[in-house]
Every structure is written in C-alpha cells, then in structure tokens.
Design a protein with these regions (language model features):
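Soluble catalytic domains of enzymes that build or remodel membrane lipids, polysaccharides, and related
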Residues: 106, 112-127, 134-319
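N-terminal, active-site-proximal structural segment of metallo-dependent hydrolase catalytic domains
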Residues: 2-146
Length: 319
C-alpha cells in the first residue's frame, strides 16, 4: 500500500497539470489567434477541471499527496478562471436610447444542404414569424418555393448565402475574402429607416484566413450607421479574432444576457455542441430578444433575434 502512494501522487500531478495546460490554452485563445481553436472547448475543459477539483477535495486524495490544501486551492482557481468566461454571457448588453424605433426580427440557420432542414425551417418561421430569414448551405432549387411569401430576396450563390425579407432590399454586394467564402451584404429598408445586413459563413479557425475574414466583416460593418452582422462564424464568442471583430466593428453580441446556447452540434443526438452561429449588431439598434431553436435535420440549430431600429429617417417612398 505504501508503494502505491508515490505512483498515485505522480498520476495526480500529471492529471492536474494536464487540466492546467488545457485551461491555459483555452484562456490564451481569448488573446492570441494561434490558440483560438481551444476556446471552442472551454466548457468541456471546465468540466474536466471541475472533476479534478472534486477529486482534490476527497479524503482518498488527501491521504496520498503532499500538502493537499494547496492542490485544492490550485484546482479551484483553475475552475474559477475558466468559469468566468462562459458566465460572462449572462451579462446583458447596454442599450442605446432610441426615438420612435421600428421593429424587425431575424432568423439565421445553416441548412447543411438538407431538404428536410429547409422544410423544418419553414415550419420554424411559421411558428416564430421573422421579417428576415438568412440561410447558408442550401441550393436555390431547395429554396424556390420554401419562402415564396417573402417578396424580396438576394443571394450570393458562390458562398451559398441567401436572404429572404419582407422589407425592401437594395445595394446588394458580394464581398470577396482571400481563400474564404464571400460575404453577402445588402441594405434593408424598414419603413423610413435602414440598416446594412452582412451574412457570412466563415472557415474554421484552423485556417490562417479565419482572422482576416472576421476583420473584413468588422471593416464592412463600420461603413454603415446601423448594421447587423450574422452567420456561421465558426468561432466561439471568446476567441481572439471574434472578440477583435466585435471591438473593431463596434458590434454587440445578441447572445449577451441569454447564456451559452450551443448552435452547432458535435454528435447526432445533439448533447454536445458549440456556440458558433451569431447575430451581432451596431448603431441605433437594440436587441430585445434572442433565442436558439433546436432542429432535427441539420447539424446547426436556428437562431432568432428581435430588434428595434432608429437612426436617420430616409425619404418617404413614392406611391
């Protein structure tokens, strides 16, 4: 029995150090692009660290290592440092003062080229009406009849991005990105006010162009007084490139105040996932509601936000 204690202590150290390394890489991903991929797994790293912290609190553990209180304090610190990151999503955004705003709603979903997912989204929109529906990974043949009650639509077929709107759309632009999918940029007119909508489907952060693409989105967002930037960003809210996009684009995250809300799922049963689909906004826009809508036929869930829009009044449209 005495001989097993040193082996246990060595194993405990290895496990503890591995949790610290994992946590460190995750936290570094909030600052450095090269570590950004680790932020995708912060909740799983947190669960691992929490399990280690529980182990250090047991009598079984205390009897087999030197100075167990220090181990416990270290384990709790690692858990606390990581927990602050996802918990930050519970802090709501501060709103801007708006005079006589207009209301609109937006739904986004990556359809994964599944016809069943298209039909599922149609049913979602019927139950939760949206003024604007934006989708990715679909073919125009799949969408031809699905959103026929939306009088305005635009697309960038090279990126498989589509916008369907009950409000007039204009100034459609396909914005190119180096070694990444194009953006779909369009101006949306809500009665006498307007905003720019940028839809994106960004490559994974393991590619070098990921950060440049998000930086380009921030740059385009600042060209308009009011903007909505949304899509499958393939990034968590805490990854360094995404945080920089929010900062440089003066964008707010619709998830703030609503929590984790995993939108892409690793497993078919959708028990494990990542929050990589986003709706962000800037200017004279406030977010009044944000929700995730679980789906069955795509690996992505739908996300929906409700907003109020103010700002400069445009000329009244001619009859």
């Amino acid at each position: 029995m005495a001989a097993s204690a040193p082996r246990f202590a060595s194993l405990a150290k290895i496990i503890f150090i591995s949790s610290c390394v994992t946590a460190g890489c995750t936290l570094l991903g909030m600052v450095y692009d090269s570590f950004a991929i680790f932020t995708h797994f912060i909740c799983y790293s947190l669960a691992y660290s929490a399990a280690i912290a529980v182990l250090t609190s047991t009598t079984f553990f205390a009897r087999r290592v030197w100075s167990p209180p220090k181990w416990r304090k270290g384990a709790v610190f690692v858990v606390f440092a990581q927990a602050l990151v996802p918990l930050s999503l519970l802090i709501p955004n501060g709103g801007v003062e708006l005079n006589n705003p207009e209301r609109f709603s937006v739904t986004w979903m990556n359809l994964h080229y599944e016809t069943a997912a298209v039909n599922e989204l149609v049913q979602i929109v019927k139950k939760r009406p949206s003024d604007i529906v934006v989708v990715a990974e679909a073919k125009i043949q799949q969408l031809a009849e699905a959103f026929s009650d939306y009088p305005f639509s635009r697309e960038v077929t090279s990126a498989s991005l589509y916008v369907f709107s009950k409000f007039p759309l204009s100034k459609v632009t396909s914005v190119s990105n180096d070694n990444d999918r194009d953006f779909l940029v369009v101006e949306v007119r809500v009665k006498r006010r307007k905003f720019t909508l940028l839809a994106a489907h960004v490559r994974w952060p393991i590619y070098s162009q990921h950060a440049k693409t998000l930086a380009n989105a921030a740059q385009w967002a600042t060209r308009s007084e009011n903007a909505i930037v949304l899509g499958d960003m393939n990034s968590t809210p805490w990854a360094a490139p995404f945080r920089r996009m929010l900062r440089d684009g003066d964008l707010k995250h619709s998830r703030q105040g609503y929590g984790w809300l995993n939108s892409w799922h690793i497993d078919s049963d959708k028990h494990f996932g990542l929050p990589i689909d986003h709706i962000t906004y800037r200017g004279k826009i406030n977010n009044t509601k944000f929700e995730l809508i679980e789906t069955e036929h795509s690996d992505h869930s739908a996300i929906r936000g409700e907003y109020v829009l103010a700002g400069k009044l445009t000329r009244k449209p001619r009859d």
